[in-house]
Regions:
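Short, conserved loop/helix-junction motifs that constitute active-site signature segments
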Residues: 162-166, 384-389
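Flexible, glycine/threonine-enriched loop-and-boundary segments that flank and lead into catalytic domains
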Residues: 373-388
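A short, aliphatic-rich alpha-helical micro-motif
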Residues: 136-137, 186, 262-263, 359, ...
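A glycine-rich, hydrophobic/aromatic-adjacent loop/helix-cap motif
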Residues: 262-358
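Internal, active-site/partner-interface "lid" segment
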Residues: 216-241
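N-terminal export/assembly segments and adjacent metallocofactor-ligating motifs
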Residues: 1-214, 251, 335, 366-369
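Core structural elements
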Residues: 233, 256-267
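Flexible, glycine/charged-enriched surface loops at secondary-structure junctions
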Residues: 73-77, 217-222, 269, 300-307
């Protein structure tokens, strides 16, 4: 029985300290509300009427039903549906792809959250990757753009404080006055900038306008490592600070000074996370943001560039290919199964008789590590799809 959790003191990022979420994991394990036995629905769908059954009975029933779906409609009529859950590596990258891949089940594109970040940044820097977040310790100007780091990333905040202790200035950009925004010290040159929600891109375009207008670009780096500078220059020519001020609610002088500071206080590092992508222009946010360090050459400086997720610290802990065994998806002469977008679950479930061109409709949905009725768009359509026979 687990009675205590401890962090790994040798981990380069956490250094053995657990975040509040992980510290409470055992409360969930031992919660009186935790389900310990399988429950089978006995009433109409949506009523929430269940009976307790044994594990043997539950597993046999599930296996029989899955087998019937596969034999009648094919493997792609089965949709495994999961997301980040508790962020555990095994929970997210465990044996489930291997298990369902062997059945030829439909694959899931987990596009409801983080992938937008990589897709947007990839359009600018080609890889979608950013700088090591711990390199912010070497920054002289740190922009926390749309992230409440002090509250939600306690492992990174000491790195930022260490940089500030050596003279780094902090700029917090957020529509909300967060705990991180309250941590700024204007006497030291820190600043809190509060654009209206969803208008960040306008401010970025105006910053690029100022940087190019004032000759603050790193022309040698641009010539050696970028393409399309002339097109970008023309695109931002009309995005004056005054125009951006009208869109963002941030004073033109504030935007202008931010642009000058970003280009002249070196190295300048930007830290942003998934909160910035949670609106209709999420991918474009990161595509545009990636242009700023390209204009100034900050990508080439230690402590410069854009820091995103710290997931790279766990990339080598699990041999994902050995777990997934993607070759099983095409075993026995099968083609690779189709991939369905998780954010389209409502549409997927309400088309049970799809045509041959896009494969069979879904007749079995297996959900774990997520709650699609609460987190996926078009909840009412999802409810209708789940209630069908």
């Amino acid at each position: 029985v687990a009675i205590k959790l401890r962090g790994n003191p040798d981990h380069p990022f956490s250094q053995g300290e657990l975040c509040p979420k992980v510290n409470r994991f055992l409360d969930r394990v031992h919660s009186p509300d935790r389900l310990l036995h399988p429950l089978r629905r006995v009433g109409p769908k949506g009523r929430g009427e269940f009976e307790q059954i044994s594990w043997d009975e539950a597993l046999a029933d599930i296996a029989s039903r899955i087998g019937d779906v596969i034999s009648t409609h094919g493997g792609e009529a089965l949709l495994p549906y999961s997301d980040a859950g508790n962020q555990g590596l095994l929970a997210m990258t465990g044996l489930n792809p291997r298990f369902f891949g062997h059945m030829g089940a439909s694959k899931l594109l987990r596009a409801i959250c983080g992938p937008t970040v990589g897709a947007g940044l990839r359009m600018t820097n080609g890889t979608g990757r950013g700088m090591d977040a711990l390199e912010l310790e070497h920054s002289q100007l740190i922009l926390l753009w749309g992230t409440n780091t002090k509250l939600t990333n306690r492992h990174l905040w000491p790195t930022i404080e260490a940089a500030r202790g050596r003279g780094a200035r902090l700029v917090v950009i957020d529509p909300i006055r967060t705990l991180t925004a309250e941590a700024i010290d204007e006497a030291r040159g820190d600043r809190f900038i509060q654009p209206m929600p969803g208008t960040d891109i306008a401010m970025m375009l105006a910053m690029m306008h100022v940087i190019i207008r004032d000759g603050l670009t790193d022309d040698a780096w641009i010539a050696a490592h970028t393409t399309g500078f002339e097109e970008l220059r023309d695109a931002v020519a009309d995005w004056t600070p005054s125009r951006a001020a009208a869109a963002t609610g941030v004073a033109a002088g504030v935007i202008e000074q931010l642009a000058i500071d970003y280009a002249t206080v070196r190295p300048a590092g930007i830290r942003t996370l998934i909160g910035a992508e949670h609106h209709e222009n999420g991918a474009m946010f990161f595509r545009t943001l990636g242009c700023l360090p390209a204009l100034t050459g900050a990508w080439a400086e230690r402590g410069g560039g854009i820091a995103k997720s710290v997931g790279s610290y766990s990339e080598d802990l699990i041999d994902v290919a050995a777990l997934y065994r993607p070759d099983l998806e095409r075993s026995r002469g099968r083609r690779e199964p189709r991939t369905l977008n998780m954010s389209r679950l409502g549409e997927i479930l309400t088309r049970p008789h799809a045509g041959a061109s896009d494969g069979p409709g879904e007749h079995a949905l297996i959900v774990w590590n997520c709650n699609p009725r609460a987190t996926v768009p078009r909840a009412e359509l999802i409810r209708r799809g789940m209630e069908r026979d």
